[in-house]
């Protein structure tokens, strides 16, 4: 039972970093399964629903902006990945993680650079993590519509930068990120 693991939201300026772990059955039927970044939002949503229907186990976990600021994004990502794997309802025999780094886990673990496009279980985790984080950003957009989170998902786009200058830094912004830290520093002057 191979668990694929990936994250979403490392580079965003606001919100959680989300990790997902997915164990697929050998006979899964998920056409177009690939790296979430290569799929439209609608296709990701459809595949995510199918992954939840077909997977042996799916788990999502995240670290908050406060945890990101305390640990740094690298360790917060590893922490979210570990939480996702540990909360799977079925123990994996091996864990495949997208990227170069892996958290300490009680299971054999391998990292695969570009694994979200190479390993189906990692692709599935990529989709689940992205859809989960996007939903969090859409919910945040409902609370703070002036920031445009539904469109840019918290990344440092021009619209996000403009909203920050106009409306200020929110409690869920990652204060350790240089652009946010600079705004906070300038606002103290």
UniProtKB/Swiss-Prot annotation:
Q: What does this protein do?
A: Endonuclease that specifically degrades the RNA of RNA-DNA hybrids.
Task: Please name the taxonomic classification of the source.
Answer: Bacteria, Pseudomonadati, Pseudomonadota, Gammaproteobacteria, Cardiobacteriales
Q: How is the cofactor bound?
A: Manganese or magnesium. Binds 1 divalent metal ion per monomer in the absence of substrate. May bind a second metal ion after substrate binding.
Q: Name one GO cellular component term.
A: ribonuclease H2 complex
The answer on whether this UniProt entry bears the keyword Hydrolase reads yes
Q: Which gene encodes it?
A: rnhB
Q: What is this protein called?
A: Ribonuclease HII
Q: Where is the signal peptide?
A: none
Q: What biological-process terms (Gene Ontology) are attached?
A: DNA replication, removal of RNA primer; mismatch repair
Q: PROSITE patterns per the record? A: RNASE_H_2
Q: Name one Pfam family in it.
A: RNase_HII
């Amino acid at each position: 039972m191979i668990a694929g693991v990936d994250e979403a939201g490392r580079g965003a300026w606001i919100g959680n970093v989300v990790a997902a772990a997915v164990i697929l059955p050998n006979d899964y039927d998920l056409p177009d399964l690939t790296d979430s970044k290569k799929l439209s939002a609608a296709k990701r949503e459809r595949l995510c629903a199918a992954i939840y229907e077909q997977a042996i186990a799916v788990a999502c976990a995240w670290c908050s902006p406060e945890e990101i600021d305390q640990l740094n994004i690298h360790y917060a990502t590893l922490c979210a990945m570990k939480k996702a794997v540990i909360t799977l309802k079925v123990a994996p025999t091996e864990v495949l993680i997208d990227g170069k780094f892996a958290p300490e886990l009680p299971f054999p673990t391998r990292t695969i650079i570009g694994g979200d496009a190479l390993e189906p279980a990692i692709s599935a985790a990529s989709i689940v993590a992205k859809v989960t984080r996007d939903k969090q950003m859409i919910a945040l957009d409902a609370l703070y519509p002036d920031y445009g989170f539904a469109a840019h998902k918290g990344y440092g786009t021009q619209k996000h930068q403009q909203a920050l200058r106009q409306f200020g830094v929110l409690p869920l912004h990652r204060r350790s990120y240089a652009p946010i830290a600079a705004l906070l520093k300038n606002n103290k002057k």
